[in-house]
Amino acid sequence: MSANNGWEPRTRLGKQVVEGEIDSMQEALNSGLPLKESEVVDQLVPDLEDEVLDINMVQRMTDSGRRVKFRCVVAVGNRDGLIGYAEGRDDQVGGAIQKAIDIAKLNIIDVSRGCGSWECGCGRPHTVALRTEGKAGSVEVELQPAPRGLGLAGGETVRKVLELAGIEDIWTRSSGNTRTTVNFAKATFNALQNTAEARVPERTFEKREVIE
């Protein structure tokens, strides 16, 4: 695999990707090497999609007067098990979105999917493999395996994140201020991240910290 658009990797993981030693995102995540270059994801997941979940204008008073920045909440995924989440801030909306996308790529995880519902038995990876919970601020989200054909039983924000992750069927339960999109999306991502933690060896996951 050759470098894309003149990318010259600076990390060991990036070099292994360019040299063809690592040729899948799952292999990269299981390598134990920290993911610090978004270009790694660009190379290994060319079909990655992004979804802007929320855009907010944030005002702050400084010595020079009122400063305005935009905060964007973004999720990225390939609809086949890979999902990332991040927030980005910038003076311009476009800049905030791009920052969030780049950071979300560095936060990408491989969700543990399966046919985890006792009501089903198809053996396809259409739902989460196990019950999981996630929390962000006052919001708590619980995801439970569901039988094939149920669909995504949850709010719009939850559905957008789960669709990008490749989850087709799910039972959800949420509490707290779920109208706050940023916390609702982050709690959902944290729940999915817990499924990844449950199956990845500790020595590998200890370096996978979510970037703020």
Swiss-Prot record:
GO cellular component assignments: small ribosomal subunit
Highest taxon above the source species: Archaea
GO molecular function: rRNA binding; structural constituent of ribosome
Domain S5 DRBM: 48-111
Keyword annotations: Ribonucleoprotein, Ribosomal protein, RNA-binding, rRNA-binding
Keyword Hydrolase: no
Database matches in Pfam families: Ribosomal_S5 (PF00333), Ribosomal_S5_C (PF03719)
GO process terms (BP): translation
Function: With S4 and S12 plays an important role in translational accuracy.
Subunit and partners: Part of the 30S ribosomal subunit. Contacts protein S4.
NCBIfam families to which the protein is assigned, alphabetical: PRK04044.1, uS5_euk_arch
Domain notes: The N-terminal domain interacts with the head of the 30S subunit; the C-terminal domain interacts with the body and contacts protein S4. The interaction surface between S4 and S5 is involved in control of translational fidelity.
Similarity-based family: Belongs to the universal ribosomal protein uS5 family.
Protein's name in the database: Small ribosomal subunit protein uS5
Gene: rps5
